[in-house]
C-alpha cells in the first residue's frame, strides 16, 4: 500500500477514454481505482497497464472532456468499490456505485470491490438442481439450473422484458430471492421504461414516494450506450458484485444482463485504445479471458446461488461471430422467443422446439418429466412437419391419426401460454405461478389424449390443467 506522499500522480496524456498518469516512486497496482476531479465531479479511472517505471495507463469510467495534462490524480489503493446489500434494492446505480435515480444516497450495509476471484472448487455446490420458475413452457422443456447461465434470444417486441419481469417476480415469491438487473450498453430509454415498469408492476417500490405495502425485489445497475467503453466494460461486474453479496448471505439470486454482447463490444473498444493487437473480426485478443472471468463468478456455492439470464444480441444474425460464440460456451440453457408464436397471441412466446437445456435429462429431472417433455416436442415437431400439407391441401386431406396430432399440438401450444402477474395491469386476468408437478401432469394428460374432448380455447391463458377443464365447462355452458 502506498503512503500518502506518493499516492498523488499527474495526468501526462489523454486519448479518448484512456488516460496516462505519472507517479513518483510507487506505482498503483493493476485494477486499482484512481480518482480525480473533472469539472467538480468525481472521475474514477481504473489502472489497466504499467508503462515503464513511473507511468500507468488507466481507463476512465466517465467522459474525459475537460481533463488537462498535469492535473492531480489520487491512488485509492484498492479496486473500484460499490455499495452492496438490501439498500441497493429498488435503486439505480452506475458502474462506480453512485445513485443515478435522484432519490438520495444508497443506504448500503457495506462496500465490496467489483473484482473478485471466482469461488474455489471446494466452495462450489456440485448438485444439479432445477430452479422452478412457475412458467410452464420453461419448466417443462428448457428448465433452468440453479446457478446456471441462460441465454435469452429474441428480436424487438416479442416479450423479453415481460419475461424478465415475471422471472424476477416469481423468484422473489417462490424462493424469497432478490434479483439484480445489469443494463450493459443498451438504450437509456429502455432502462428508464424498465425502471418505471418495475414500479408499476410492483416488482420495486418507488424510492421517491415509497409504498409500505411494496417491498423492492430488484437492484438496477446501468451503464448505457452513451457512456464511455470503460463504464460499459465494468458495469456487468458491478451488478455481479451486488448479486454475490446476496448469494453469500444464503439467497438464490437472479442476475440479468442485457446485453452480454455489449460487454464484449466495450472490451473491444478499450482494447484498441490500449494498443493491443486485435484478434479475429477486430475483437480484443483477451475475449475468452474477459468472458470467462465474468461467467465463472456466476455459480452455485454451498451458501446460495446466482442464476444468470443473459440477453444475447447476435450481430447480423451470425452465430459464428466470436462474441456470441464465446458466450454460448458458458450457457446451460437457451430460451428463444419467436415472433411467429407472439403473432398467434401466445405469451410467453417461447419457441418450444428451439429452446434447449442441459438440465433436461432423466438423471436430473426424472423419467416422467423427461418422457413428457419429449412427447410434447414430438407432437409439436409432427405438427410443424404437417403445416405445409395443411397450407396446400387443407385439414381434410390428413389421415385420422394426423388430424388428432394436429388437434393435440394446437392445444399444447395454447396450454403453453399463461397469464403473468406483471401483465395483470394490461390484461386484467390474474397471474398464475404453476408448480412443476402441475405442469407435468397437465401436459402428460394432453399428449395422452385425456382432454381431446375439450375445445382449443379452453387451454388458452390458463395456469393448471384443472383451470382449463373449468374453462372448457364454462365455454360449453355458454355455447349451449
Swiss-Prot record:
Q: Which residues form a coiled coil?
A: none
Catalytic activity, per the record? ATP + H2O + 4 H(+)(in) = ADP + phosphate + 5 H(+)(out)
* Record carries keyword Nucleotidyltransferase: no
**Keywords carried by this UniProt record:** ATP synthesis, ATP-binding, Cell inner membrane, Cell membrane, CF(1), Hydrogen ion transport, Ion transport, Membrane, Nucleotide-binding, Translocase, Transport
Q: Which GO terms describe its molecular function?
A: ATP binding; ATP hydrolysis activity; proton-transporting ATP synthase activity, rotational mechanism
Q: How does it sit in the membrane?
A: Peripheral membrane protein
**Where in the cell?**
Cell inner membrane
Q: One Pfam family, short name please? A: ATP-synt_ab
> Where mainly located?
membrane
* GO cellular component terms given for this protein: plasma membrane; proton-transporting ATP synthase complex
Could you say which EC number(s) this protein's record lists? 7.1.2.2
Taxonomy, superkingdom: Bacteria
The entry marks the following residues as binding ATP, namely 154-161
Tell me the subunit arrangement. Answer: F-type ATPases have 2 components, CF(1) - the catalytic core - and CF(0) - the membrane proton channel. CF(1) has five subunits: alpha(3), beta(3), gamma(1), delta(1), epsilon(1). CF(0) has four main subunits: a(1), b(1), b'(1) and c(9-12).
Its biological purpose? Produces ATP from ADP in the presence of a proton gradient across the membrane. The catalytic sites are hosted primarily by the beta subunits.
Entry similarity comment: Belongs to the ATPase alpha/beta chains family.
Q: What is this protein called?
A: ATP synthase subunit beta
Which species expresses this protein natively?
Answer: Bradyrhizobium sp. (strain ORS 278)
Amino acid at each position: 500500500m502506498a503512503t500518502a506522499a506518493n499516492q498523488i500522480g499527474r495526468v501526462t496524456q489523454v486519448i479518448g477514454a484512456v488516460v496516462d498518469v505519472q507517479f513518483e516512486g510507487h506505482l498503483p497496482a493493476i485494477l486499482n481505482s484512481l480518482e480525480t476531479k473533472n469539472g467538480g465531479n468525481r472521475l474514477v479511472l481504473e489502472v489497466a497497464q504499467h508503462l515503464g517505471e513511473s507511468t500507468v495507463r488507466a481507463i476512465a469510467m466517465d467522459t474525459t472532456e475537460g481533463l488537462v495534462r498535469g492535473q492531480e490524480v489520487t491512488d485509492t489503493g484498492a479496486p473500484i468499490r460499490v455499495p452492496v446489500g438490501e439498500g441497493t434494492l429498488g435503486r439505480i446505480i452506475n458502474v462506480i456505485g453512485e445513485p443515478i435515480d435522484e432519490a438520495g444516497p444508497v443506504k448500503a450495509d457495506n462496500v465490496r470491490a467489483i473484482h473478485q476471484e471466482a469461488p474455489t472448487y471446494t466452495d462450489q455446490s456440485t448438485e444439479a438442481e432445477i430452479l422452478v420458475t412457475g412458467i410452464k413452457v420453461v419448466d417443462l422443456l428448457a428448465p433452468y439450473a440453479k446457478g446456471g447461465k441462460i441465454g435469452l434470444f429474441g428480436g424487438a417486441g416479442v416479450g423479453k422484458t415481460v419475461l424478465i419481469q415475471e422471472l424476477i417476480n416469481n423468484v422473489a415469491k417462490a424462493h424469497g430471492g432478490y434479483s439484480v438487473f445489469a443494463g450493459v450498453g443498451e438504450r437509456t430509454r429502455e432502462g428508464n421504461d424498465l425502471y418505471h415498469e418495475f414500479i408499476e408492476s410492483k416488482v420495486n417500490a418507488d424510492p421517491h414516494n415509497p409504498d409500505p405495502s411494496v417491498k423492492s425485489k430488484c437492484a438496477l445497475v446501468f451503464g448505457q450506450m452513451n457512456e464511455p467503453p470503460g463504464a460499459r466494460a465494468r458495469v456487468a461486474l458491478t451488478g455481479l458484485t451486488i448479486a454475490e453479496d446476496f448469494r453469500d448471505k444464503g439467497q438464490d439470486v437472479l442476475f440479468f444482463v442485457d446485453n452480454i454482447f455489449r460487454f464484449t463490444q466495450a472490451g473491444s473498444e478499450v482494447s484498441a485504445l490500449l494498443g493491443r493487437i486485435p484478434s479475429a473480426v477486430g475483437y480484443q485478443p483477451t475475449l475468452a479471458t474477459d468472458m470467462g472471468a465474468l461467467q465463472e463468478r456466476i455459480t452455485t456455492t454451498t451458501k446460495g446461488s446466482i442464476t444468470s439470464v443473459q440477453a444475447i444480441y447476435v450481430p447480423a444474425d451470425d452465430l459464428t461471430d466470436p462474441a456470441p460464440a464465446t458466450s454460448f460456451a458458458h450457457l446451460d440453457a437457451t430460451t428463444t422467443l419467436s415472433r411467429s408464436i407472439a403473432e398467434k397471441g401466445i405469451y410467453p412466446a417461447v419457441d418450444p422446439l428451439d429452446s434447449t437445456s442441459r438440465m433436461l435429462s432423466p438423471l436430473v429431472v426424472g423419467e416422467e418429466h423427461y418422457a413428457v417433455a419429449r412427447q410434447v416436442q414430438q407432437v409439436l415437431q409432427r405438427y410443424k412437419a404437417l403445416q405445409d400439407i395443411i397450407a396446400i391441401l387443407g385439414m381434410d386431406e390428413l389421415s385420422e391419426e394426423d388430424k388428432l396430432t394436429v388437434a393435440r399440438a394446437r392445444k399444447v401450444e395454447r396450454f403453453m401460454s399463461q397469464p403473468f402477474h406483471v401483465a395483470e395491469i394490461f390484461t386484467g386476468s390474474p397471474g398464475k405461478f404453476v408448480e412443476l408437478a402441475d405442469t407435468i401432469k397437465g401436459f402428460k394428460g394432453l399428449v395422452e389424449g385425456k382432454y381431446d374432448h375439450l375445445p382449443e380455447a379452453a387451454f388458452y391463458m390458463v395456469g393448471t390443467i384443472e383451470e382449463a377443464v373449468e374453462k372448457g365447462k364454462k365455454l360449453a355452458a355458454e355455447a349451449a
